[in-house]
Regions:
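Conserved alpha/beta-hydrolase
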Residues: 205-227
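N-terminal cap/lid segment of alpha/beta-hydrolase-fold proteins
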Residues: 138-177
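Short, surface-exposed "cap/lid" segments of acyl-processing enzymes
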Residues: 175-209
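Alpha/beta-hydrolase active-site loop
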Residues: 235-256
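Short solvent-exposed beta->alpha transition segments
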Residues: 32, 39, 54-102
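Short beta-strand/loop motif that positions the catalytic acidic residue
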Residues: 368, 374-376
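Conserved alpha/beta-hydrolase "acid-adjacent" motif
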Residues: 381-387
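Accessory cap/linker subdomain of secreted extracellular hydrolases
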Residues: 287-367
Length: 423
């Protein structure tokens, strides 16, 4: 399960506080930035850098859930970020985009350890409605050896309609006759069509690999990525995942190159957890594949992730470990129903987490009259071999069920060795 964002989980490992003054970070006064959106974004970053968290918090849109971008949360986040990446060395005016009434500024920022994009969402009156830390442009894609780029072509498509239309692409094999088709459903967070995480693009690997073998694959940018600022703070799984996945399946089924009787769904992480429900709702799939889909009770999964990360912190008294322990207490309170609905935990309000906790993917899969394939990486500490065991226990002996463990693969199904970490 990956809903606690990579940024949030990595942040829990961080300890130090940014002390460097702003100095010449901008190379110019922020008031000289190209437009009012950049000026507002750069001025806000300057407040964070100067330690003026109360003032920074006062510029946050009142519609943002309590506990998300308040002064205390901003202070903790900025301290965590600097401890992970070192001192902030420079920022510059960034690209400005619009999504409905919101304006998104992608500010390039250089830290000692690496560069990233500080993505700030602004309202028309220049209040802050969103803050994300996005990896800088990944390195050029190096296709795996199993991909034959001459075996398929890519066709741009649009999933759904306004106001939530999503750009996507179908990898179409260059074969005669209708071919099988697969829709890929992302994990949590504002993922792009490739499910890009650092230098990894697991969904492009899958799409191009399957297309090389004669299978059409549809992948698309997630709603929370394309329309993030317009998505309600009370968004649920229906709006975040299920509705768009069903629309994508319908789109692929209607394409002339694809055999409508051989449409499959492949979900990763949160997408894997919801894959059986999406399959049940669609009613016409030929099969479902689950990659790294947790089967344990959600709060057990979340607590397990946090405890694992805490175990990587050698000093039990370090600020990072103290923050982890505090978050574990918060999770316990959330499980007990003691967190108000408007309070954000790990970037989402408590009702969201309760909705995730109510999902029982194994029970739903057991009721599907179609094949189910479950794949799991042995180095994955988010979805683990315990989850795979529960899938097997619930579905073993059922016609069409298969499972496979890949001992050396992580949550993204990339190879590795040694202790797995969030990095």
């Amino acid at each position: 399960m990956a809903r606690p964002s990579r940024q949030a989980l990595l942040a829990l490992l961080l300890t130090a506080t940014l002390m460097n003054p702003l100095g010449d970070l901008y190379g110019q006064d922020p008031t000289l930035a190209a437009d009012r959106w950049n000026r507002a974004a750069l001025e806000w970053i300057q407040l964070l850098q100067n330690g003026s968290f109360e003032e920074a918090g006062s510029r946050v849109d009142p519609a943002v859930p309590a506990g998300a971008l308040g002064a205390a949360e901003l202070e903790t986040l900025w301290a965590q970020l600097s401890a992970q990446l070192g001192a902030l060395q420079s920022v510059s005016p960034g690209q400005v985009g619009a999504s409905g009434p919101y304006h998104i500024v992608r500010v390039p920022a250089s830290f000692e350890a690496q560069s990233l994009i500080i993505q700030i969402t602004l309202t028309d009156d220049l209040t802050i409605s969103g803050l994300y830390f996005v990896p800088a442009e990944p390195p050029p894609y190096d296709p795996p050896a199993y991909i034959d780029q001459d075996a398929f072509e890519e066709v741009e498509v649009t999933v759904g309609n306004e106001p939530w239309a999503l750009p996507g692409v179908v990898s179409v094999p260059k074969l005669q006759g209708p071919v099988p088709g697969v829709v890929l459903v992302h994990g949590s967070g504002p993922n792009d069509r490739d499910e890009t995480i650092g230098g990894s693009r697991p969904f492009r690997d899958l799409a191009w690999g399957l297309a090389s073998q004669g299978i059409a694959v549809l992948r698309y940018d997630k709603r929370t990525r394309v329309h993030g600022p317009r998505v309600s703070a009370t968004i649920g799984l229906e709006e975040e995942v299920i509705e768009d996945a069903l629309l994508a399946l319908a789109l692929l089924r209607d394409r002339p190159e694809v055999n409508p009787a051989k449409i499959f769904l492949l979900g990763h992480s949160l997408g894997g957890i919801l894959a059986p429900e999406i399959g049940r709702r669609d009613g016409g799939l030929a099969g479902v594949t689950v990659l790294a889909g947790s089967a344990r009770p959600f709060f057990e999964v979340l607590t397990g992730q946090l405890e694992y990360i805490a175990s990587l912190e050698e000093d039990p008294n370090s600020p990072a470990r103290v923050q982890l322990d505090s978050l574990l207490v918060t999770v316990e309170r959330m499980q007990a129903g003691e967190i108000p609905d408007d309070e954000a935990v790990l970037g989402a309000p408590a009702p969201y987490w309760r909705e995730v906790a109510a999902v029982d993917p194994v029970a739903t899969a057991a009721g599907l009259p179609i094949p189910v394939l479950v794949l799991q990486g042995g180095r994955d500490y988010q979805s683990t071999t315990e989850d795979l065991a529960l899938w097997v226990k619930g579905l073993e002996g059922r016609p069409g069920f298969e499972s496979k463990l890949y001992p050396n693969l992580n949550h993204l199904f990339g190879p590795g060795s040694g202790t797995a970490t969030p990095e």
